[in-house]
Amino acid sequence: MEALSQRLDSIQEELLSLYEKESTSLESQLQHWNLLRKEQVLLHFCKKHGIRQLGYTPVPSLLTSQECAKQAIEMVLYIESLLRSPYSDEPWTLQDTSRERFESPPQKTFKKNPAIVEVYYDGDRGNNNEYTLWGIFIIGNADGEWVKTESGVDYRGIYYVDSEGNYVYYVDFSTDAGRFAANGHYDVVFQNMRLSSSVTSSPQPLVSAPEDTVPEEAPDSAVPAAQKKTGPKTTRTLGRRRSRSPGVQRRPAKQRKQAAPDEADSAAGDIRPPAPEDVGRRTTTVGRTPPGRNRRLRELITEASDPPVICLKGGHNQLKCLRYRLKSKHSSLFDCISTTWSWVDTTSTCRLGSGRMLIKFADSEQRDKFLSRVPLPSTTQVFLGNFYGL
């Protein structure tokens, strides 16, 4: 048991060192996936032998570790193949070789240089979707070789050009237009160039408009991101951001009781707000205050002393390794730390975006000390906040 725990600790230390190093070599990305493979194989072995937790790491189910190990092995094979291609000396980041990006449409392709394409429906900028255009694709062809192609956008959708010169669309704007546009009209905006729904011609390469101008009339058709290159056919539709929902109506004013301004001011005059240095010093949940005038105001002022937190956003495995290092080396600089978690879709349990992890502190001074002393990977985003009820 101790030997297994030490082995897992060693793997996770190597992983976190890679995250902090932020190497852009393809060899480092191969090492990253090999370490993930070893980690999942070790956890799978532990689960088979009835071990539920190894050090600070809970052991996942057999199916979970098996699937993660298979994905890691697949990525190792693809990256080893890419190392034998002319593109092995290019800069490659963890994001460029991530499983999520590799599997995003078009699938089984390496992608770089993301850019946002916005689509507005019915001329309403509040009713819009955003799509990702990948500036560079590296795609495996029928001969088992990797070839580079680039992407472009026109009124129909986002495409790349295959080896025969065909436009292969991996985003079709009309699919969502049928759902979100009442009259079927939509406008495509990319790099400050606008394509109107009146455009029906075939895609043609055009030069982007200056960044400070948006043409009132649409160009002949396309706003390309690059010249023609080779690549196989793949046609899929990217995930998208849903249009904004209608605003929530407020209750009628007659249903809300309001005290007269002079009455409220006089009643609140004896309530002392916390000093700036006291904000964030509270470590327990605020109880219910006695009933009476301005009870909610008194609660809010008391809640201003709730304990501070930070929310870290990044890859799930990256956050897990970071949590291990924080607990083993910097435990005196925070109060407690959560497991990694994700937002889920409103209609299913599918994870959305990157992982998150919360760290709670006794006070703002401890949080400031943590942020100044603990090195965090630059690929990890940090958000500050306070929670009522922690």
From Swiss-Prot:
Residues 199-296 are annotated as: Disordered. Pfam families: PPV_E2_C, PPV_E2_N. It is found in: Host nucleus. One of its GO terms (biological process) is DNA-templated transcription. Residues 306-390 are annotated as: DNA-binding domain. InterPro entries: E2/EBNA1_C_sf (IPR035975), Nucleotide-bd_a/b_plait_sf (IPR012677), Papillomavirus_E2_C (IPR000427), PPV_E2_N (IPR001866), Reg_prot_E2 (IPR033668), Regulatory_protein_E2_N (IPR036050), Regulatory_protein_E2_N_1 (IPR042503), Regulatory_protein_E2_N_2 (IPR042504). Its main location: host cell. There is a cross-link at K313 (Glycyl lysine isopeptide (Lys-Gly) (interchain with G-Cter in SUMO)). The keyword Hydrolase does not apply. The keyword Ubl conjugation applies. Phosphorylated. Sumoylation plays a regulatory role in E2 transcriptional activity. Residues 282-292 have a biased composition (Low complexity). GO terms for cellular component: host cell nucleus. Residues 1-202 are annotated as: Transactivation domain. Keywords: Activator, DNA replication, DNA-binding, Early protein, Host nucleus, Isopeptide bond, Phosphoprotein, Repressor, Transcription, Transcription regulation, Ubl conjugation. GO terms for molecular function: DNA binding; DNA-binding transcription factor activity; nucleotide binding. Belongs to the papillomaviridae E2 protein family. Binds DNA as homodimer. Interacts with protein E1; this interaction greatly increases E1 DNA-binding activity. Interacts with protein L1; this interaction enhances E2-dependent replication and transcription activation. Interacts with protein L2; this interaction inhibits E2 transcriptional activity but not DNA replication function E2. Interacts with protein E7; this interaction inhibits E7 oncogenic activity. Interacts with host TAF1; this interaction modulates E2-dependent transcriptional regulation. Interacts with host BRD4; this interaction mediates E2 transcriptional activation function. Plays a role in the initiation of viral DNA replication. A dimer of E2 interacts with a dimer of E1 in order to improve specificity of E1 DNA binding activity. Once the complex recognizes and binds DNA at specific sites, the E2 dimer is removed from DNA. E2 also regulates viral transcription through binding to the E2RE response element (5'-ACCNNNNNNGGT-3') present in multiple copies in the regulatory regions of the viral genome. Activates or represses transcription depending on E2RE's position with regards to proximal promoter elements including the TATA-box. This is Regulatory protein E2. The gene is E2.
